[in-house]
Amino acid sequence: MPTPETAFEPQHNFNPEIIKAKNIKKITFEIIDKKDYEVAVDKNLIEIYEFNTDGLLSRYYFTSIVKTFERQVVSKNRKGRTLVKTFNDYVYDTVSTSYFYSGNNLILKRYHDGMNYYESRYYRYDSLNQLTKELRYKETNNSPDRSVFILGNQVLLSEDSFQYKKFSSGQLKCTLLNNENRSYKEKITNFDSLGRKINVNEIYTSAAWIMQENKYEYSGKKFVAAQFEGNANNKVILRNTYEYDEKDELYSEKQFKNETLVKEISYVTDKNDSLLNSIIIRDPANKTIRIVRLRYDTGAVSKSDR
């Protein structure tokens, strides 16, 4: 489910209401990569999303290949000729992020690189549920079991505060301050008559020449496009477009960079329960296809095991 807040995030976004209503506890993304004119290779890559009882994401983790080893298998055919086949074996790391909430507000996000590095972000909110402070720490885990976290040492990496000023029903200004209480960035968000974001402008106080703008487009109730434009290094324009079927289910997404198509994504939905079944990601420049199959685990039976 694309939203203005997550349009350019690499991580998938889910609708908590649907997750809760269907009692989904976990979604596993099984990933296969394929190059054009080559056989698909299953490297056992996965992404897993776990949810709490409110349908909110509680943990996200994925496997990444850190080493590849070639293995040769020697055999003989029926005529006695020696055949040598080469296979790849992989060594994996599991990278994870855990999420903790107070009500629907995210109050802690903890990243773990799979080894010994932990980085956490703590969030505080005002009475209007607006984010007022973000503290980022490097942390250590005192537990010998990596699946259990016991807080050891904390080193503060950054501390940001957020102050808000509402100019009208359609505009909100947010000033970002560092740990010395000095302003370093301003964000001005404009909303339409339905309260939806239509653009966000960012200006850096200490480098006023750096400007960033996000624009959002809608068709009826549907979110159909997001565009980012920035000039921090070289000028870059990112644009995502979304298409929906007759049931208002997302079925196509295109991602552009400086008007060049970089990804074309197809979403296949199960007609019986309207759950996403698979994702096909086409990279035209590298001539590759990523095929993602989704497996759902509910409070009862895994959908793929039915």
Predicted regions and their residues:
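Buried hydrophobic residues that stabilize the cores of well-folded domains
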Residues: 1-306
